[in-house]
Design a protein with these regions (language model features):
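Short extramembrane helix-to-coil loop segments that connect adjacent transmembrane helices in Major
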Residues: 1-5
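Small-residue-rich hydrophobic transmembrane alpha-helices
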Residues: 8-66, 70, 106-117, 121
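Transmembrane helix-bundle signature of multi-pass membrane transporters/permeases
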Residues: 10-17, 53-54, 93-96, 126-130, ...
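Alpha-helical transmembrane segments of multi-pass membrane proteins
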Residues: 17-19, 83-109, 135
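Short runs within selected transmembrane alpha-helices of multi-pass transporters and secretion channels
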Residues: 24-27, 96-115, 121-133, 148-166
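Short alpha-helical transmembrane segments in multi-pass integral membrane proteins
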Residues: 34-99, 140-183
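Hydrophobic alpha-helical transmembrane segments in multi-pass integral membrane proteins
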Residues: 133-141
Length: 183
C-alpha cells in the first residue's frame, strides 16, 4: 500500500484517538453514575443516564469527524508538513464519520456495563466483534492490500461491538421489567 497510505492512516488514527480520548470521559461518567445508581437501588435512573451519555458522546465525536471531512487540508496540515499526504487523505477521511460515531456509542455502552460490573458481557462482546467483525475483513484487507477494507474492518468491529452490547442492554431491560412485574 505504500508509505503515503501508512502516513495517511497514522494521521486519521490521530484524529480518531483524539475523539476517543475525549469521548472516553463520557464513558467514565456513565460508568460512575450507573454504578452509583445501581448501588443505591435506583435502577430507574440508569437508562436516562445512558441515553443522555450516548447523545453527548455523539455531540463530542461528530465535530472531529465532520471538520476533518470538510477541511481535510487544513486539519491534517496542522499534523504534518507533507503536503502530498494532506492533499491525498481525502480518499479515506470519510471513514472517520461512521468510525467515530460508532466508537462514541460503544464507549458509552462499555461504561454502562462497567458501572453494572458486568465484565463478562464486555469480554464476550469484544471477542464476538473481533472474531465476527474485525478479523475476517482485516485479513481480506491485508490479502487484497486494500486500505478501504482495513478501515471497513475497524468500523465493523465497532458496529459489531455496539450491536452486541445493545442486545445485552435490551436483555437486561427485559429482565428488569419482568422482575418488577413479580414484586
Amino acid at each position: 500500500m505504500g508509505t503515503t497510505i501508512l502516513a495517511e492512516n497514522g494521521l486519521l488514527l490521530q484524529i480518531a484517538l483524539l475523539s476517543q480520548f475525549t469521548v472516553n470521559g463520557v464513558g467514565l461518567i456513565t460508568q460512575t453514575l450507573v454504578g452509583n445508581f445501581k448501588g443505591k437501588g435506583e435502577s430507574e435512573r440508569i437508562m436516562p443516564v445512558l441515553y443522555t451519555s450516548i447523545v453527548h458522546g455523539l455531540l463530542i465525536s461528530l465535530p472531529f469527524a465532520v471538520l476533518s471531512v470538510l477541511f481535510p487540508v487544513t486539519v491534517f496540515g496542522l499534523l504534518t508538513s507533507h503536503i502530498e499526504v494532506s492533499y491525498s487523505i481525502h480518499a479515506y477521511v470519510i471513514w472517520l464519520v461512521p468510525l467515530l460515531s460508532l466508537t462514541a456509542v460503544a464507549f458509552v455502552l462499555e461504561g454502562y456495563f462497567i458501572g453494572l460490573k458486568e465484565g463478562a458481557i464486555l469480554r464476550n462482546s469484544a471477542l464476538t466483534a473481533l472474531g465476527m467483525g474485525y478479523a475476517p475483513i482485516a485479513i481480506a484487507g491485508w490479502y487484497f492490500q486494500s486500505n478501504h477494507l482495513l478501515w471497513t474492518s475497524l468500523t465493523i468491529y465497532m458496529a459489531t461491538l455496539m450491536f452486541s452490547l445493545s442486545l445485552q442492554i435490551l436483555k437486561n431491560q427485559q429482565n428488569y421489567q419482568s422482575s418488577l412485574g413479580q414484586t
